[in-house]
Regions:
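Peri-membrane helix termini and adjoining interfacial loops of integral membrane proteins
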Residues: 1-9, 120-132, 211, 260-267
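Hydrophobic alpha-helical segments embedded in the membrane of multi-pass proteins
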Residues: 33, 55-59, 81, 107-108, ...
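Mid-bilayer segments of alpha-helical transmembrane spans in multi-pass integral membrane proteins
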Residues: 85, 89, 104-123, 135-147, ...
């Protein structure tokens, strides 16, 4: 019960004295910022499967970057852009239903990832864990700068296409009558999702970025109606999830200093505690969605 008997030490002190945890939280908050904006459109447009596909579709680019000795973020960006263009092309030309076509492309990208990983001696267990689960507790100042730059570009694109996305999402016929270009807006939306995934994967990994892209916006969509309010509410929920998730992982699983400096943690090895921190953040976000669903269901039952 230390969180009640000594609230300062439990709730605040972990964030004041450990630069590793501070950078981890900043990376998490940058992830929340971009996924709250982009994820709102993902939820409103009913394209959550697309977000999942793009989240996993970056893996071949990351694997290729490790294989060639390049920058994983650059590899992820190239793969995400290729995946976005590929999804758009398949949606336009394939006779298959939209989700089936996206699933086919996703399977191909995952298979390519397996081939690259199997063929590359340069990719070890540590690299594979970082690809899947991120490296939140190993975030460096340079990582934060790269992430902030990608987040800034994504937010700028979202601002430029905000009106077009708003009209196209709720009334495609009206968008055409207004002289808008739905194809260009659709491509911009795909690239926007690709940018948000690329900006977030280094922190939370390709498997968990989907949770941040969907969970806070989904909870916000059940609480408010207007798009800007949804984005703001999603950001608040995501921020709370990052902070509470970091605290839970810190108190229950160990401190970042122990993780990085302890004798049991060798170079190139990702400890379970490191993997667990972004997962704990995502788990809190999903828990918020479930709580909102239950509360809303109870309220609707009482009013009916």
């Amino acid at each position: 019960m230390e969180f009640l008997t000594d609230p300062w030490q439990w709730w605040v002190e972990p964030f004041t004295g450990d630069p590793l945890l501070q950078r981890a939280v900043l990376a998490g908050l940058l992830t929340v910022l971009v996924t709250s904006v982009v994820g709102t459109w993902v939820v409103l447009r009913g394209t959550t499967y697309l977000g999942e596909a793009l989240g996993h579709g970056i893996l071949p680019g990351v694997a290729a970057a490790y294989l060639l000795g390049g920058n994983p973020t650059a590899g992820a960006l190239v793969a995400a852009a290729a995946m976005a263009v590929g999804v758009r092309g398949i949606q336009r030309r394939s006779p298959l239903p939209g989700e089936s076509a996206i699933g086919l492309l996703l399977v191909g990208m995952l298979a390519l990832t397996v081939v690259l990983v199997a063929a590359a001696d340069e990719i070890d267990e540590h690299d594979l864990q970082e690809m899947l689960f991120g490296s939140l507790l190993r975030t460096s100042p340079a990582d934060l700068l790269r992430q902030a730059a990608l987040v800034g570009v994504a937010i700028l694109v979202a601002l430029v296409f905000h009106h077009a996305l708003l009209v196209l999402t709720f009334d495609e016929v009206q968008a055409r009558l207004m002289g808008m270009r739905p194809r260009l807006t659709e491509l911009a939306f795909l690239l926007l999702v690709a940018l948000s995934v690329t900006a977030s994967f280094n922190a939370v990994g390709s498997l968990l970025v989907f949770a941040f892209l969907v969970a806070p916006p989904a909870a916000a969509a059940m609480l408010v109606r207007r798009v800007p309010a949804m984005m703001a509410t999603s950001a608040l929920i995501g921020t709370g999830s990052v902070l509470l998730g970091a605290l839970l992982a810190h108190h229950l699983l160990g401190t970042p200093g122990h993780i990085h400096g302890g004798p049991s943690t060798g170079a190139g090895h990702t400890s379970p505690e490191e993997v667990a921190m972004p997962a704990t953040m995502a788990l809190v976000a999903v828990a918020v969605v479930l709580v909102v669903m239950v509360v809303r269901g109870v309220r609707n039952d009482s009013e009916s």
